[in-house]
Amino acid sequence: MPALVLLGAQWGDEGKGKATDLLGGSVDYVVRYQGGNNAGHTVVVGDQKYALHLLPSGILTPECTPVIGNGVVVDPSVLFSELNGLNERGVDTSKLLISGNAHIITPYNVTVDKVTERFLGKRKIGTTGRGIGPTYADKINRVGIRIQDLYDESILTQKVEAALDGKNQLLTKVFNRRAIEAGQVVEELLTYADRLKPYVADTVLVLNKALDDDKVVLFEGGQGTLLDIDHGTYPFVTSSNPTAGGACTGSGVGPTKISRVIGILKAYTTRVGAGPFPTELLDEDGEALRRIGGERGVTTGRDRRCGWFDAVIARYATRVNGLTDFFLTKLDVLTGWEQIPVCVAYEIDGKRVEELPYSQTDFHHAKPIYENLPGWSEDITKAKTFEDLPKNAQAYVRALEEMSGAPISAIGVGPGRDETIEINSFI
């Protein structure tokens, strides 16, 4: 059975947790392939709400095996905090698998992240301060610590000492901080080894064997397309590849085994942190979207910046991911607006531009060109089929579908697990 990829088609926070959870009952494995605990997703099951940061959403589905792939960076303290929280609420987490090749977020990675952002001041990127970027930097610089290193104290010590050589120079001579003792770091990391061991596996082998055995594997991206280190609004991006290509490198599953790529689109647009955002609303409409949509970051606790739907970035997401379908979320939030503007193109230096500009400078100068679509006032949270939606809501969905370049196969009409309209089956 071929694999599916599910990813954010905007700047993250699109509702991937809801979408993954919806599919969880139909898949055998759910795989996180990049990012770390900088990605937050909320899943509502019955009257229970679960806020996950590192664990795959599939951990809430008993029949599913959740997997943390080699492309993820893992903070063991956060991992065990999430596992403990789920265990206390009666969730069985014993099926979790973690790649031994996944890199560990060390205490010094977190320290470097925080002091760097503080040092940059107004020029800061707006990271979550959780050590994600420095951990990926260590990975690329080949001084990273992998989970498998916890089981060879000699290698672990050598790697920590090598990594701290440069970092202590930075901390003491640039940031006026104390040097970090390698021995203390090694001691702390070794405390996680025994508890991690039951979860550690050769996940590349596990996933490929599962696909050979006709199991259904769902790859779950964190963040969103416009936060991709290569294809996002650089430098205001994350440090990994949430786009579809990252599913392959972050899991060890080849591209020919992926048959469907599903993009999650919010019915409007949000962004957390710094960076360009052409449709951002700094008025009462933006505040209303934030309030009605509950737009506060699961991981950061920061208010999200809100704006109207941007079809230009949706088309871009379709292109760079090879999207086959969209899952549209939070359509219910738009109930009550008489007119709903949709950005169909940009104006840049007096010219109409219908595709995402290649130039960072041009994108910073982009002004949205809107088309107004009629709104609706009816409550849509009880809708079970597309035809149950008000005519104007149907027209809004079809307009977004046409502008974005891929069919909308499911629609979220509320936060609950059952508040979803499935138009076309994903599996």
From Swiss-Prot:
Its cofactor is Mg(2+). It catalyses: IMP + L-aspartate + GTP = N(6)-(1,2-dicarboxyethyl)-AMP + GDP + phosphate + 2 H(+). It holds the Pfam family Adenylsucc_synt. GTP binds at residues 12-18, 40-42, 304, 330-332, 412-414. IMP binds at D13, E14, G15, K16, N38, A39, G40, H41, T128, R142, Q223, T238, R302. Substrate binds at V298, T299, T300, G301, R302, D303, R304. Its EC number is 6.3.4.4. Its main location: cytoplasm. One of its GO terms (biological process) is IMP metabolic process. Binds 1 Mg(2+) ion per subunit. Mg(2+) binds at D13, G40. Homodimer. NCBIfam families: PRK01117.1, purA. This is Adenylosuccinate synthetase. The gene is purA.
